[in-house]
Amino acid sequence: MFVRKKKHRSGNIGVIVAEKICGKMKELVTIGVAYNEGEVDNLVNEAKEWISKEKSRRHPQLDLFGEEREACDRERDEVRRVLSNVSNILLNGCDLILDRTFDRIGFNRIDDEVFRKLVKARLAYPTSKAATVEYLKNHFDEDVDLSKIYRYLDKLSGHQHEIVQDISVRHTAKLFGGNIGVLFYDVTTLYFEADYEDELRKTGFSKEGRHSNPQIILGLLVSLGGYPLAYCIHEGNKYEGHTMLPTINEFVSKYGLENFVVVADSGLMNNANIAELEAHGYKYIIGAKIKNESQEVKSWILEQPKRNCQMVEYDKGGGRRLLVGYTDDRAKKDAYNREKGIRRLEKAYKHGALTKGNINKRGYNKFLSMDGEVKVAINYGRIADDSKWDGLKGYLTNTDIPIQDVYTAYHNLWHVERAFRIAKSKIEIRPMFHFTRKRIEAHICICFVALKVYKELDRMLKVSEIKMSVDKVLALAKTITTIQIKLPLNKEVYTQTMLMARHQKIAKLFDEDFWVTQ
């Protein structure tokens, strides 16, 4: 016995059960007539069930496991019926996790679905805006027109910047019991794949070695733990030391901050900046350029015994304290780097590649000097003097906090450095291909929110003791599907996220109660 589909002149399809007897086909029963493909599948399943029952009727003595076989057939038919009503399959594991993190921070205050999608895409699939459109379509069945995205970027920068910073600050303050006690500030450079400059994109000193590419300077203010608070964008050729004070002044004024400490690297500071910090009444901990101190201070530093992990203090007057620490590890690193630089100089000297143009203070060129009117020589006396400073690191502060706390606070600057690494390697904030100021600012705004979402998800993983990185969680989530089944009678759509055995490590992230209780 077999199932036969017979097409009528009207275009309808009859489903029949037939069998061959002595080489001739005989129709046993007509199951029904189908008017569309969906009905055909249902009638075919009914026909198979009829055949199973007919075989049991004809050969009861052979059907020792008839009831079990019949139950299995019904089970298969039920599965086929369910699968025939699947209306969509979404690869949306990342989407579900990022949505909940986005909302938990409070970014759902921004009633803007395009903004939400661009932030999530930046975390799940960081790429160009054109490729983002394809990603949204293929993974979430969401149609977003590319021209609409570009028009959206043109209007985004004007009104979202302040809102997203406000949401981020309020959420971070909540994590710290309402008080943001330490502000860490640093800058990086972001280059463009372009050959020309404009009023914003300028060539300048590149932290990425892209000195011929136009760039912008991005300043970032973060809290303890590396949670982003505020950002600023400046021309690519601006002195980075001039970017910090305006950002901090605006931030403090807006949020009425009191009793806080500013922590920054020595590269951002000069005497004018330090004086301005003090004029505003700010407390600070900054890296000190101990080799630029007065001869009296330098002599005092070099006279101090060098003990591993020990710090000494020098009172500079006016409330300023100079703290100097020494570690064996830093001493080894300083010596190694210097020796490597000297070997390069000696190699260049041997081949006659050193000229007057090399006499500058860049890197290890500081060890070069003129031998007579023309000849360039390596000054080994300077090298010997430089070695005296191996292992020493200075910190300048106007706080009265203990020495060890100053050291700990300063070395938490790695949170800013890590934030930049996340932005560049995970969120892929650069290189940028936008060329208008509005779109550049919009792109940075989206990346800032993506960084905040990344950091909050990282915190949630630690709180919930999920021993996986954000990157690994998102990679695993990309293998999670959600099926949508359209119920044939009431036309409702039933949705089910499919978590397999390998997904159990992160299963709690898909539990609504988890996001409420944490």
Spans of features found by a protein language model:
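Conserved glycine(s) in the ABC-transporter nucleotide-binding domain "signature"
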Residues: 1-113
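Anion-binding and metal-coordination hotspots
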Residues: 2-4, 12-13, 24-25, 98-518
